[in-house]
Amino acid sequence: MTLDLSKPATAGYLSGFANEFATEALPGALPHGRNSPQRAPYGLYAEQLSGTAFTAPRGHNRRSWLYRIRPAAVHRPFEPYAGAQRLVSEFGDSADVPPTPPNQLRWDPLPMLVEPTDFVDGLVTMAGNGSAAAMNGCAIHLYAANRSMQDRFFYSADGELLIVPQQGRLFIATEFGRLDVEPFEIAVIPRGVRFAVALPDGDARGYICENFGALLRLPDLGPIGSNGLANPRDFLTPQAAYEDREGAFELIAKLNGRLWRADIGHSPLDVVAWHGNYAPYKYDLRLFNTIGSISFDHPDPSIFLVLQAQSDTPGVDTIDFVIFPPRWLAAEDTFRPPWFHRNVASEFMGLVHGAYDAKAEGFVPGGASLHNCMSGHGPDADTFEKASASDTTKPHKVDATMAFMFETRTLIRPTCYALDTAQLQADYFECWQGIKKHFNPEQK
């Protein structure tokens, strides 16, 4: 199977989360019974890609063996890349990261572009925490692009990329094979994996959480049982596919927050076969098995957890990826929208489609909001009044929506770009100013 981004993929996918996969684009390309034979089949080179330490416990160890036409070391020296100057990966006080205000923040979507711009040059960092160099925390980027990557390839050595398309499909060709991803789906590209992005629909826009720390995993289900939330079988990994092209290509690397470029005389997407458990994958958010109350109260939003990156503190994650999909609300005598809240964690939200049930106006697809540690947030005035008077004896379906949240245990620090951009809604605080005083000590 060879790569061709000019049309939709025809190959199927490998099902499962972090499975030990084995796949080959040519029969017999995978060595039998060993990883690095003296001579690999078809004159290929054996190369291991390690996503965790060699000595990580077996249940957490991630690596894959690639059998490729040329090793990844074959390229010219890197030099600084002049494009994509809006990326940040260190979130201490700096010229890129000003003091973090406690204000609630909300943004309109990035405008679609006029100048031809590909996925790499369309990246901008909105916020983040921690440090790429120290391998902890994350960066939250937006992307807006209108041109496919042409004879150039990209990888991040800083972290794995959780990509959430909002507008436009992405045809992602990786070293491991191809992922076709549309809005309502997500893709995860592991640290170090080289890839190119084609835009079959022209304009494309979306969100990225770049995870600097421990790899994303499925959460434990506890008393939910053995099934529910995001089921492992619904995660899809590409089958091996390759291209054998020579010419003048460009390889873009992201390391310690900086972009670097190198000339390369061939396509690096030349892996003919691979096996292992460190590989790209995608997931359709519409397959999420939503859990909720069928008696009273609105449970904590942890019931909407899709993926997590664990910390060294049990029960506390460095990153939670949470979605708010279509669902039935049936709790009686209950305020059904998300309640008013102050959180020790920090919450960055985005909207893929429709409307969010806690905000009647202002939060639109492609937009974003940030509620940092202990910043009060919750439904706007109009939503509160309507939900307080609604008939809760009848179930109600929240439909035609897909919101999500990147939640982190440490402060999410907005960049100078995020605080200075014209997309920042200066009047966001007004959505709560109309909340009425209902208190009456004489009436219970």
Swiss-Prot record:
GO terms for molecular function: homogentisate 1,2-dioxygenase activity; iron ion binding. Its EC number is 1.13.11.5. Fe cation binds at H341, E347, H377. Homogentisate binds at Y356, H377. One of its GO terms (cellular component) is cytoplasm. Pathway: Amino-acid degradation; L-phenylalanine degradation; acetoacetate and fumarate from L-phenylalanine: step 4/6. Belongs to the homogentisate dioxygenase family. PANTHER family: HOMOGENTISATE 1,2-DIOXYGENASE. This is Homogentisate 1,2-dioxygenase. It comes from Burkholderia orbicola (strain MC0-3). The lineage of its organism: Bacteria, Pseudomonadati, Pseudomonadota, Betaproteobacteria, Burkholderiales.
